[in-house]
């Protein structure tokens, strides 16, 4: 059998795969090598055999290196080397942190596309204030590039809304906790862009592509990894940052299945700009056994995630994901439906959601775990990647501390104690945030706006629109608990970060109206951008009507033209419409409808499904997503919609959306 072994030095060029030609093959017997080399799996005699093989390999390599290797390869390695399984965010940030501390790092990544193109599959990632601060403490220049590339969402309104009505349930203030503690404001960045930035900072010479770790041996003073192709690399520490299906974790503690959350997730990116893009960063739309998340990711794009309760390993018919989603979220608010409609079918992806309950012990000997390999979380808190970044900072910090102690005491570096301190510092915080993510998933998917929702035979109660007691009490609890929770999640780790000044960027400054938007829904609605339209629901002969947002002008609706009046005439030649039926006017960015004592009346259905008649000569406010009926037989019905100027045609198939003037 052929065994390839390379002794790699700190000199950067020799991490690169193009130098594999210097590796010397050593021919042994035809007996296969052990599949697993960890101590708890290999019998005594197989261990002895492996040590003999390794001794022969070392002797042969030494002769080979003397004869054929460049002079640099004969220099003794004197830097502490960290072997990192996995080139995801956690692995790359750890490699960067190690590099900044003066350690060697070598990242093993089985598929370079996981670094260069993972974002195409998994979409943008939210990097919250706590992770950005940790990244600043690791490398301020890299953090600056990440923040400059990302899209700020923490300077706007974020929170929970009712999935059907689209009304706010609770708003999150992620700006104040960051500003008060001198932390960067939360961003969203393309996962691919983030990993490219990190990979450049780490250097291609420290990333070994096409390399999959299948086994390792901890010798007490060193650790060696064995790749799928038989190559072996030696270091002082092995860190498993290889994700929820971690091979390093499996070898350490045995195979175990991750926990299925009960939800599958559809995700997509749309060229779509909502009309409230300047005031809202992200929303979580709540429903029963399903929920929907949307977020601005910059560059005129929106990222969304649709969670639905169903068994794992499901599948969809070819090109059928959008159709399935429209059925699942049928009857939900326009914010959800419009975003699904605006997404191309081929950009919709599906994956099941799993997590791993954090374990008490993260490693053994000179091997430890980091990120999803030890505490994979559900995505509801947006903290999965953030925790991996915090892990990376803490691990590098503890290793640097151990090195300083070693120099002072003139004793070998106590790696095992450093790893124990790393676990101790991270264990509680990770467990609490993991629990919060699970609770958020439960709350988002068990939300019931009204009595009768999810009650089977008693579902008829929903038509009475009686608020569910859990909805009311839940809002009260969240209102007072959320500020404390966000303060701890976003700022609770900042006191442990060394070498970082407590500063806020001018570019992170929020609108002066932010506090008012949190407290006043009307003020938030008045700040809504875009254009207002009446879209016909059951008559294809009528074009959408754009309403003029001008306090000095108004619309007159009637079955005859009113071009000679002061108002803007909207001509609806139908028997249900009176000659002078109604007037629509705008005041302070709010629209009102007044029925002008029409013969058949004017009816309004709000976004919670309540239908009522507009009283004659009394201005009645209407909002986006309301329906307006001229006449009582539901034949002349319009849906009120607000669309961003640049993206309205993408959702409505290029219909003529010219104003009526």
From Swiss-Prot:
Needed cofactors: FAD
CDD domains according to UniProt: FHA_ZEP-like
InterPro entries in UniProt: FAD-bd, FAD/NAD-bd_sf, FHA_dom, SMAD_FHA_dom_sf, Zeaxanthin_epoxidase
Alphabetic keyword roster: Abscisic acid biosynthesis, Chloroplast, FAD, Flavoprotein, Oxidoreductase, Plastid, Transit peptide
GO cellular component entries: chloroplast; membrane
Residues annotated to bind FAD: 81-109, 359-372
Tissue-specific expression: Expressed in flower buds, lips and leaves. Detected in roots.
Biological processes annotated in GO: abscisic acid biosynthetic process
The FHA domain, residue ranges: 555-609
Presequence boundaries: 1-59
Keyword Plastid: yes
Keyword set includes Ligase: no
Pathway: Plant hormone biosynthesis; abscisate biosynthesis
Record-linked SUPFAM superfamilies: FAD/NAD(P)-binding domain, SMAD/FHA domain
Enzyme Commission number: 1.14.15.21
Cellular location(s): Plastid, Chloroplast
PANTHER family the record matches: PTHR46496, ZEAXANTHIN EPOXIDASE, CHLOROPLASTIC
Function description: Zeaxanthin epoxidase that plays an important role in the xanthophyll cycle and abscisic acid (ABA) biosynthesis. Converts zeaxanthin into antheraxanthin and subsequently violaxanthin.
Protein name as it appears in the record: Zeaxanthin epoxidase, chloroplastic
Organism annotation: Oncidium hybrid cultivar
